[in-house]
Amino acid sequence: MKFFMNSEEFARRLCSWQREKGRQNLPWFTSDPYRRWLSEIMLQQTQVSVVRDYFARFLQAFPTVDDLAEASEEDVMRLWAGLGYYSRARNLHKAAKEIASAGRFPQTRAAWEKLPGVGSSTAAALASFCNGEVAAVCDGNVKRVLARIFALSAPINQSKTAKLLQQRAEALVSRTDPGCYNQAMMDLGAMLCTRTTPKCEQCPVGEFCKASRQGNPLDYPVKAPAKPRKTALVHALLCVEIKEEEPWVWLVLRDEVQKGMGHWKGLWTLPETAHPRGVEVARIEHVMSHVTLTLAVHRAEVSELPPKAFAVPASRLTGGPLPAPIKKLLSTLLFDAQLF
């Protein structure tokens, strides 16, 4: 079939489209490996529209990789708070220290992949963007594009199919401009070959696409049923004191993985208890990638708190390293004068 025989034409059309109509105004479109690496980590599982502001704040706080390496974990987590998938921030900090110690950024895909938090697809992106290495990105957008081009009937969330997609991606990637090609594939998935409303009539490689020719692009990609998400119920303690006419909230620094809340390691959270005694004042549900967390919040006295608890004035909560659902919860509860 044509899409097997003419990969050069496929890549040429993609890159031509990307240069003319792709996303050109993103702040990390530069040869600076620090910006590229920072953006690729932030873009894992997160949309461009969300990443923009966080990216700008990180660059303002940590203009270079050395600045990031020298920062405290608390400062890194504080700036990351709200972006989610918090292990990314911890790995980012660890990787910054490794890069700073080495005195340079990785020069190959294999070297990129050795950094904490850098998987195969991210390493391919960075190697192609920063080093010009012929390496194919195969992230979620690219997998969807390839599944439609080849009309793959096998579920893409199975390991065998993932390997096949990676092989197809490596076969198609441009040998002359792999960075442009990878960006084009990601842009195509984000802008035209979207999950629910593919714009096949605008696609620069539509004639190569089997699903488009069949007239059924929405039938692809095929996915096997996902495993049910685990659930966890956590009882948290809310203790508020009034000092100098300002409420102070007692918090703890999460320093361990517990009850499926590993994503919050390194952040400020409410103290927890296995045996709540106070009145329940709030209950929230928060869906994470691996677990649906129900947080039951109980009023408590200082004497009930763990030894490592500390009090923070309400005015510091906005800029503190709190998970987004905890920050939102506290902003609501602290305005309820009937609680205190």
Give a label for each model feature:
Residues M1-Q24, F29, D187-F340:
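Intrinsically disordered, low-complexity, charged terminal extensions of DNA damage-control enzymes
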